[in-house]
Each structure stands twice: as C-alpha cells, then as structure tokens.
C-alpha cells in the first residue's frame, strides 16, 4: 500500500466523511478532484482528465481540476445534473501556515440547498422537500434555503402517493429527503422521480418527532411551536425538523434568514393534482422546448423576482374562500382603474432586485459588494413606491402594503450605510479589494495612501533607471511569485549598473532588483496585504449589521412581491381586456364570451368566444360533441382556466364571469403512454378516471375528453356511458362536468338524465369542404366529420375517397338492418341502440333481462365429451332454435 502525502490524506478524510458527494479540494488557485470523482467531473464538465502520483493501491491517480475563480461557472452544471458537491477549502493563509495547510469541508451543495445566484436560471423558488409519515398520516415540508421560506403541512391518507405527487407538482422542489427506512418504498420514490425530483435518503433519527421539535424550537428561539401552527401535528413537525437538519448539515452554519415556519392546510386552497397541472399547462409547457404556452407565461408581467414567485404560487394554489379572493381582486381593480398609479408603481418596481435572495446571501455569509449595491438600489426604491401610492391607495390590501413598507424605520440607515461604505462599481470578488469607499475608514485611507504613494514611486523609479542606464526598453514589473523586478532584454545586458542584483533569468531577458526597489516592495506589499485584510474585515462588519435586520428586510420583500404580483395582473388585465369575476359560494358557473387566455394570443383570424352556463341542479353535465379539431378540448380547458384564474385572484378573459367556488379541478384530457411504468394509453386513462370518480366532490369541476378512445368501440362506448351515468347520479348534488365525446349515440342519454345537456361545436359544410365555426351551441350532432378532418390533415385523396365509400356501405347496411328488424317486429337488444342504464339512478332498480334458452343450453354443453357427429347435430339443433326466436 502506497503512503499518502499529507494533502492526499486530507482529501481521503474529506471523501470518507462525504462519500455520497463529489469533493472539490482547494489546492492553491485550483479546486481539484481525484479518483472516481475526477472521472465524473471531467466527463460532466468536459474538462481534461489527467493523473498525478499514485492512489492507495499504487495505481495512477486520476485528476481533474478547475480554477478557483471559475467555481460559479462550473458548480451549477454539476448541481443541475443532480450531483452533490462538497467544497473543501484551505482554512488558513498559506503564507502563515506552519507545515501542511489546514483544510476542511465548509459546505455541501445539493440541488435543494443551493444558495448562490449562479445556480438559478429563473426567479422560481428552489425548494427542498421533506416527507415523513406513518399509520395513514403524512407530513410534508418545503424549505427554500435561498430565500428563507419554510412551509409545512400534514394530512391523513391511507394511499398517499397521489397526494404527495400533487404537492410536489405544485411546489416543484429540486430535491426531496425521506428517511432511509421510507426510501425502500419504491412506489413513492418513483412517483417523485417522474416529476424530476432528486430523492435522497437521510438519517432516520432526523425524522424523530421529539428531536425535530427541539431542533425547531432551538432554531427559532421559542419554547413552543404553537405560534407556528404545527404543535399538534407530529408529522408536519418531523418533516420540518428533518428539512432544517439537512439544510444545517449541508451548509455547516446557522441559517438566520430562515426566521419563520408557516403551517398551511389543503382546505385553504383549490386542489390541482399533477395530472391537471400537466394537462392545463398552468406553469409549464408540456409540449417540449419552444414557445412557452403556459398560463403563467401569459399572466407574468412582473418586474421583480419576488412578484414572479408569488404569481406562480397563486396560480398553483388558488383560494377557495370568497372573502380572501375578493381581497385580491379589490387591489387588482384599484390598480387596473388607476392608470397613473399602476404606471408609477411598476416604474419604481422595475429597479428592485431579488431582495429575498440578496438577504439570504448576506446572512449566509457569501455575498459580495455587488450584492450590497443591488440591495441598496432596491431598498432605495421603497420610499418612491410608497410615495406613488399616496395617502389612500383605495383598497385594504394596498393600504396594508403601503403601511408595512412605511413601518421599517431602519430602511434609510441601511441604505446610507451601504452608500457610505461601498463604491458604486465594486469588483465581483471580495478577494480583489477596492470595494470600500474612500472616507469610510481612516486607517484604510492611510494604507491606500501608502500603496498609492509606493506605486507612484515605482513609476518614477522606472523613468529614473531608464535615464541612468540609457536603456529605453527597461521596465519595472510585478508578479505574485517574484515580487517587483527590473527587466532588461538580453541585448542590453552589458549596460546594467553594478548595483543591480540578479533575480530571475528568462529566455529573452534578465530580471534584477536593487536594495531601494526591495525596500519599497516591502512597503507596497505590506500596505496592499493590510488593505485586503482590512477591507474584508470591514465588509464582514457591514454585512453583519445588515443581517441583524434580516427579518424586517424579508417582510419588505414579501410586501413588494404582493404589490408587484397584483400590479402585473392588473397590467395584463387591462392589456388583454379581462374582466373582474364575481365570486360566489354557490355552484353556478356563468361565463359570457369566454376566451382561452393562451390560444387567443396565437390563433389566426381572431379567437371565437363562447358562453358557459352550468350548475349542480339543472345544467350539471355538459355533453359536448363535434368533429376533431373543432375546438372541444380548447373550450373545456378554457372554462377550467377561467375558474382557476378567478380563484387565484386574477381578472379573466370574458365579458362577464360569475364563478361558484370550485374545490378541485380534475382533468382527463390527452393521452400520454406511461411507457416507463409499463402502462398503456388505455391503462393511464382508466387510472386517471378512477381517481376522478373516487375523489370528486359536489364542489369539484371535472373535464373528461374522449373517454374510452383507448379501447374498442363497444368497450369505449360502454365505459363512456357508464361514467356519464355515475357522475350524474353521484349524490343529490351533481358534480359540475364537461364531457367531450365522439360517441354520438351517447347524446340520447339526455332524455333519461335530466341534468345532462347536449352541446356541439358548430361547423359549416361547403361541398367537400368543412369550415370550423368554433362556436358551441345547444343540441347534439350526429356526425364526426372524421373523413373531412383526414382530408384537412393531408391524407391522400384516394384514401379519403375510399373511406367515404366504406362509410356509405356501413350506413346503408345499418339502415337495411333497422328496416329488417322493424318488419320482423323484433325488439332491439343491442347496447348500441338501447338506452340501458349501466349505473342505476338512486332509488330505482334496473329490470332483470330474461335469460335466452339457446344461450343457456349452449353454456351447459360439455363439448369435450361429444363426438364430432354429436357436436354437428347439436349445433344444427341450436341453429334451428335460434332461427325461431329461441323459443
């Protein structure tokens, strides 16, 4: 076994402590990695893989490294790929170190605990998710280390996978921790991975309720968690405690900006599961790269990262309390109606940066001088924002925001502190120096004078030596290894004075120094070193003073986010002709001239608006027919998006809208084969349908598009009909539903189910051409126009012409069959033509069909015991009986 160098022993010690992480090991001006880590880093970062020395086994040691100043460029690339990286720093000044330099891991960066701004490509929250549970109760927590936001909840569910997946889909965490025991639950892990969440197993003891409670109480400096709302929620407490434990373990320092824990309940918000969020494209475009077609993209005209994050939360968690929704709508209306107020507020907001993350970096201890300048300019806009709002902004929410911004007395002092201390254009790194303004510190100014004077002397010394030696090319230079030197080209060596002392030999030149130059070098370098040390000391002092006001600054950030989010929605409403919805506690949904907020921006020739009227009593179930491409799916999505926008607190695309509160939106639209889990289109459809039928409440809104199309015609029709009956008859109050179908026979069901209403998308036939009018009108249609659509799609004329002939043959055969049946007076028993109820209406019983004797006799036959002749004779006998009607 090879004996390791002291530095490599440090590396192996760090790797042993953080075996699940890639090690970035500081060696001078580089971060280096060895062994398998080096191979991974070289591959992922596309950098050179080389070798240095031997490993423990005596083999060549793989090596990969990056310059220390390029860490912010390379580290995000590894984190975004799901790696955990441990940063091992030099813990002492190499110049002052006695023997081997002390090194140690100072932080571990993971996808869910990243805090550097270089990690984030958009202003969205970067949540760490934590899950705990048992015996049907589960706790879920979300911690954003970059902003300090901390949330927890608890719910009861014997089968929690859908619920947990829905929370993950709404909050979109980068990483999730679960206990190592729970990590064996493959179904849970897979559901989270399907949502692109990195799942990590964490020590079981971190999820202990008592340990979590004590950790939370100690961190927040409280004696009880009652004020945070989770004192009686053991799993909410344990998941929150584990999240905080993981964050503290990886960051290796106190997280003072994580100053509050908020407990929320699902009962406060409309439930939008992962399927609905995908199908409606609320915040993410599911059609791949390219133009963003999400509703968030349409509504987001925010000026600040805080406003952008809040808007996303509002859309993902719409409210279900009428007063709370109206509270938001009142503020939006004030801003929409007052053009000057809206313009002034938004103008000042445009100068505000990401205060939440800036404060997080300041408290965390990795901010730079440019962060402080950004914070100064952001906070400097607050008085102007308040002034633009005037004495009476016109509604409660805006008044509360203005008063909250006015209430922070230290705002002016913080702005003045940064303005006095930091230069207007500071360097990127605090290591570079030159960030503290002249006049802020007397000792620093004195040192700067010495450094400046010394450098002035260097310039005059260079000119003096040129004159003395007659060497015009003589120059005085500096590098970190050799210090200051006089450089003479080889062709002028004969002219050097006797007092020049050789320092370094180059290929084309020689470098020298004089006792006088050495003396001034000591003065300059000593001053520069002291300047750097003092600037760092002063910067730490300044950031500490700012960090002491972190909680107040975070509250300012929250208020600015609320104002920006509301002002953005007002701007979008005015620019897009949206109207304020009337929110009610009943179940009626009335929309006049509703429009799809995304499609109307992209459709050619103008969007055709449509009305919607539904409730739980008379117009509960809208059965929509019409050809493919006519707009059935767009119409249904349009209704649901208007409802979601309204309850999020936004104006809506319509001329009038009255929305009865919806507690949950269910969607079964589109078809995505779940190949990864081995589920076919039809299986996925049935799983999603089962979720809807089992969980919809009288307050829900259900969207079903082409149920049954993933199987045979008869099976599909039967399932579709059964679903209509089940939803219609479920409870005394019907679930508001929109159901698009291509089974035209299904429209007859409205004659027996009184709350089912038929609608269809109007089309106009012009010879062989088909014009989609995009208008939804009452009544059913008996045509699908499939061949017309095929022609529009570019199917060859020969194929569509043959399809018309086949269709005509089928229709003729159907007519002949009906006439023949009529003449014989036979009763039609086919499920295709008979309105038999697959689910009985409440309080009634379905008639029992009389068994067919031919069928019964056929069932009783023992074919295996019969000879071929006996079988043929029996078949002939049964055929004769069947020909006589079976009796």
Swiss-Prot record:
Molecular function in Gene Ontology: ATP binding; ATP-dependent DNA damage sensor activity; damaged DNA binding; mismatched DNA binding
Keyword Cell division belongs to the record: no
Tree of life domain: Archaea
Residues the record lists as binding ATP: 626-633
InterPro entries, per database record: DNA_mismatch_repair_MutS, DNA_mismatch_repair_MutS-lik_N, DNA_mismatch_repair_MutS/MSH, DNA_mismatch_repair_MutS_C, DNA_mismatch_repair_MutS_clamp, DNA_mismatch_repair_MutS_core, DNA_mismatch_repair_MutS_N, DNA_mismatch_repair_MutS_sf
Keywords annotated in UniProt: ATP-binding, DNA damage, DNA repair, DNA-binding, Nucleotide-binding
Alphabetized SUPFAM superfamilies for the sequence: DNA repair protein MutS, domain I (SSF55271), DNA repair protein MutS, domain II (SSF53150), DNA repair protein MutS, domain III (SSF48334), P-loop containing nucleoside triphosphate hydrolases (SSF52540)
Claim: Ubl conjugation is one of the keywords in the record: no
GO biological process per UniProt: mismatch repair
One protein family per Pfam: MutS_III
Family: Belongs to the DNA mismatch repair MutS family.
NCBIfam families: mutS1, PRK05399.1
Function: This protein is involved in the repair of mismatches in DNA. It is possible that it carries out the mismatch recognition step. This protein has a weak ATPase activity.
UniProt-recorded name of the protein: DNA mismatch repair protein MutS
């Amino acid at each position: 076994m090879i004996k390791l160098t002291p530095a490599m022993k440090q590396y192996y010690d760090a790797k042993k402590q953080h075996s699940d992480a890639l090690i970035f090991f500081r060696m001078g001006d580089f971060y280096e990695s060895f062994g398998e880590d080096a191979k991974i880093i070289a591959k992922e970062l596309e950098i050179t893989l080389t070798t240095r020395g031997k490993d423990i086994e005596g083999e060549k040691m793989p090596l990969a490294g990056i310059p220390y100043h390029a860490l912010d460029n390379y580290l995000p690339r590894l984190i975004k790929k799901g790696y955990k990286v441990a940063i091992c720093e030099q813990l002492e000044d190499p110049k002052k170190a006695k023997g081997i330099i002390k090194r140690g891991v100072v932080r571990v960066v993971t996808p869910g605990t990243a805090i550097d701004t270089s990690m984030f490509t958009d202003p969205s929250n970067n949540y760490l998710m934590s899950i705990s549970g048992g015996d049907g109760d589960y706790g879920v927590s979300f911690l954003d280390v970059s902003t300090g936001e901390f949330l927890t909840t608890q719910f009861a569910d014997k089968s929690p996978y859908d619920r947990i997946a829905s929370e993950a889909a709404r909050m979109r965490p980068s990483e999730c921790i679960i206990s190592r025991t729970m990590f064996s639950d493959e179904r849970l892990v897979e559901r989270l991975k399907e949502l692109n969440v990195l799942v990590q197993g964490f020590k079981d003891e971190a999820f202990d309720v008592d340990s979590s409670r004590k950790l939370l109480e100690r961190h927040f400096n409280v004696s009880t968690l009652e004020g945070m709302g989770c004192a009686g929620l053991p799993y909410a407490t344990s998941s929150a405690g584990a999240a905080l434990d993981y964050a503290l373990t990886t960051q290796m320092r106190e997280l003072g900006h994580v100053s509050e824990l908020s407990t929320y309940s699902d009962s406060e918000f409309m439930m939008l599961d992962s399927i609905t969020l995908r199908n409606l494209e609320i915040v993410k475009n599911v059609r791949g790269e390219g133009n963003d077609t999400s509703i968030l993209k349409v509504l987001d005209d925010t000026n600040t990262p805080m406003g952008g994050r809040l808007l996303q939360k509002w859309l993902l968690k719409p409210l279900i309390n009428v007063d709370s929704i109206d509270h938001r709508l009142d503020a939006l209306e004030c801003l929409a109606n007052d053009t000057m107020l809206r313009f002034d507020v938004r103008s000042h907001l445009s100068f505000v940066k990401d205060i939440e993350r800036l404060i997080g970096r300041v408290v965390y201890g990795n901010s730079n001088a440019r962060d402080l300048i950004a914070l100064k300019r952001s906070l400097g806009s607050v008085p102007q924002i308040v002034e633009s709002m005037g004495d009476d902004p016109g509604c409660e929410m805006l008044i509360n925001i203005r008063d909250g911004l006015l209430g922070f007395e230290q705002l002016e002092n913080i702005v003045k502190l940064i303005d006095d201390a930091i230069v207007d254009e500071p360097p990127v790194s605090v290591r570079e120096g030159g960030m503290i303004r002249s006049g802020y510190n007397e000792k620093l100014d004195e040192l700067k004078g010495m450094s400046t004077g010394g450098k002035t002397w260097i310039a005059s010394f260079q000119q003096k030596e040129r004159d003395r030696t007659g060497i015009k090319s003589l120059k005085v230079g500096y590098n970190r290894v050799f210090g200051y030197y006089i450089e003479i080209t080889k062709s002028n060596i004969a002219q050097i004075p006797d007092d020049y002392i050789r320092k370094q030999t180059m290929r084309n030149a020689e470098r020298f120094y004089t006792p006088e130059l050495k003396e001034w070098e000591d003065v300059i370098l000593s001053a520069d070193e002291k300047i750097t040390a003092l600037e760092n000391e002063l910067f730490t002092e300044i950031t500490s003073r700012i960090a002491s006001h972190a909680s107040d600054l975070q509250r300012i950030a929250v208020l600015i986010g609320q104002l920006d989010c509301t002002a953005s929605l007002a701007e979008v409403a005015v620019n897009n002709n949206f109207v304020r919805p009337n929110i009610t506690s009943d179940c009626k949904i009335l929309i006049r001239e509703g429009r799809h907020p995304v499609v109307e921006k992209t459709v050619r020739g103008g969007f055709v608006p449509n009305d919607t009227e539904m409730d739980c009593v008379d117009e509960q179930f809208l059965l929509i027919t019409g050809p493919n491409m006519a707009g059935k799916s767009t119409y249904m999505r349009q209704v649901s998006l208007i409802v979601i926008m309204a309850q999020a607190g936004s104006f809506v695309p319509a001329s009038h809208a009255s929305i009865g509160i919806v507690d949950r939106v269910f969607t079964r639209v589109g078809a995505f084969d779940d190949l990864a889990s081995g589920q076919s289109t039809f299986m996925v459809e049935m799983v999603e349908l089962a979720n809807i039928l089992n969980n919809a409440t009288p307050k829900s809104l259900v969207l079903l598009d082409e149920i049954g199309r993933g199987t045979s015609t008869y099976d599909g029709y039967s399932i579709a009909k059964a679903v209509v009956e089940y939803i219609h008859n479920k409870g005394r109050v019907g679930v508001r539903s929109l159901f698009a179908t291509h089974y035209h026979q299904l429209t007859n069901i409205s004659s027996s189910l009184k709350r089912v209403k038929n609608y269809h998308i109007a089309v106009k036939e012009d010879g062989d051409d088909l014009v989609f009018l995009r208008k939804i009108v009452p009544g059913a249609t008996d045509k699908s126009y499939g061949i017309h659509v095929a022609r529009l799609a570019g199917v060859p004329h020969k194929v569509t012409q043959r399809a018309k002939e086949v269709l005509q043959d089928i229709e003729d055969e159907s007519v002949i069959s009906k006439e023949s049946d009529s003449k014989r007076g036979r009763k039609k028993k086919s499920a295709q033509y008979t309105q038999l109820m697959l689910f009985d209406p409440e309080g009634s019983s379905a008639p029992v069909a009389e068994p067919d004797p031919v069928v019964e006799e056929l069932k009783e036959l023992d074919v295996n015991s019969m000879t071929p002749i006996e079988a043929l004779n029996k078949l002939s006998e049964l055929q004769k009986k069947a020909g006589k009607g079976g009796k």
